[in-house]
Amino acid sequence: VDYAHKPEALATVLDTLRAATSGRLVLVFGCGGDRDRGKRPLMAEVVERLADGVLVTDDNPRTEDPSVIFDDIRAGFSNVDNVTFVAGRGQAIAQLIAGASADDVIVLAGKGHEDYQEINGERHAFSDLVEADHALTAWEVAHA
């Protein structure tokens, strides 16, 4: 779980983890709403270059339509065939972890320590750590 929400920070995280990965390097990420739209396609370029798999999802859409954010991110990928767009960050985390192998490294980027998701001007309780814990428990049961 990392707060990386800028292209440079995301590249640093992925480069660092790549060196320690024997399996795939996969991640969930999104871009915040009502913020710099120009970095959205740049984030996609970094992910496409450095990750083996990606689920794009919500990351504090605030008052912006999440589909517009997805479109901006989609524009940065040269090929979206291996990119999955999932509305609902909890669902994206669960889906990515459920499909992971034991030697994969999973990155949940963008929210870090935050314990909320800001949607339509309201903060809703949400934690990547809590969602990952639930998904990892389910993964362990499925792979026991």
Name each model-derived stretch.
Residues 1-144:
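ATP-dependent carboxylate-amine ligase
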